[in-house]
A protein has these predicted regions:
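Conserved Class I S-adenosyl-L-methionine-dependent methyltransferase catalytic core
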Residues: 1-83
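Class I SAM-dependent methyltransferase SAM/SAH-binding core
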Residues: 84-86, 96-142
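Class I SAM-dependent methyltransferase "Motif I" SAM/SAH-binding loop
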Residues: 89-93
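A short acidic, Gly/Pro-enriched loop at the edge of an enzyme's catalytic core
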Residues: 142-153
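A short SAM/SAH-binding and catalytic strip from SAM-dependent methyltransferases
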Residues: 151-165
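A short glycine-rich, Lys/Arg-flanked "PGG" loop and its adjoining helix->strand segment in the class I
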Residues: 166-178
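C-terminal alpha-helical "lid/dimerization" subdomain adjacent to the S-adenosyl-L-methionine
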Residues: 185-239
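Core SAM-dependent methyltransferase catalytic element
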Residues: 241-261
Length: 261
């Protein structure tokens, strides 16, 4: 299961492929540590893009529809009836396609500023025959072309990477319906470093040092990293104008937050 089944919760190839990309980008990391200027997501070796998608996919398959969406207040019923959803920072579109398959009455829009990933998302949707209720576009998290009147806006393991997470959340709030919901999936993390010095936390800190933090620094961002913690994510949501924020559910690897206008 760990080596042969891409949908298995213990599938490891995605993690190994991501790690392989780190060795291929060694010279870039040396420069990043020398200058502190950062390194954008799209400047990494392409193994990172595919490896990250393969790493997250089993977790999303096992939890997104079965537990994460049901943990949100009133969202599942809206999706069953027919809702409008924006998946911000969708990458290869794994999360977008899973939701589109599970809720055929709803319309899903996947957005990411990394064009090669969006092309992969489009191709995957075609392969799976999911084209009627899903669309993908290469735009940034605050691009006006994203539109508005969304019932649900999602950020899957990406808000902490952004150069302007408050700006992204402000734009999300403006794009939601008054009774809409923002679902923020973040890596499992406590608020203090010493509370995160476990197996999962150490893995996230290591990857974050090479991927998440440099990406944010490249845009002069706050460099939250993959172990930002609940307090920091709540502060960002409140600074963006959301009035309600709660931890909806969690797994050993992720925390699912719900924010409402």
């Amino acid at each position: 299961m760990a080596l042969a089944d891409e949908n298995s919760p213990v599938y490891m190839h995605g993690a190994y492929q991501s790690i392989r990309s780190f060795f291929k980008d060694e010279d870039k990391f040396i420069e990043v540590f020398k200058t502190g200027k950062g390194l954008r997501w799209g400047e990494h070796h392409h193994d990172l893009f595919e490896g990250t998608a393969r790493f997250f996919k089993p977790n999303y398959i096992g939890n997104l529809v079965n537990s994460w969406i049901p943990s949100l207040d009133g969202v599942e019923e809206k999706l069953k009836q027919g809702a409008k959803v924006a998946d911000i920072g969708c990458g290869y579109g794994i999360s977008t396609i899973i939701m589109a398959k599970a809720y055929p009455n709803s319309k899903f829009y996947g957005f990411d500023n990394h064009s090669p990933s969006i092309e992969q998302a489009k191709e995957q949707a075609r392969k799976e025959g999911i084209t009627r209720n899903v669309e993908f576009s290469s735009v940034s998290a605050n691009d006006k072309s994203i539109g508005n009147d969304y019932d649900l806006i999602t950020f899957f393991d990406c808000l902490h990477d952004m150069g302007d997470p408050i700006g992204a959340m402000k734009f999300a709030k403006q794009s939601l319906k008054p009774d809409g919901t923002c679902m923020i999936i973040e890596p499992m993390a406590n608020d203090k470093v010493e509370q995160n010095l476990n197996l999962v936390g150490r893995i996230y800190y290591a990857a974050s040092t090479l991927v998440c933090v440099p990406n944010s620094l490249a845009d002069n961002g706050p460099a939250l990293g993959a172990q930002a913690g609940e307090t920091k994510i709540k502060q960002i949501s409140e600074a963006a104008g959301f009035t309600k924020f709660r931890r909806a559910t969690q797994t050993p690897f992720n925390i699912i937050y719900e924010a409402k206008p």
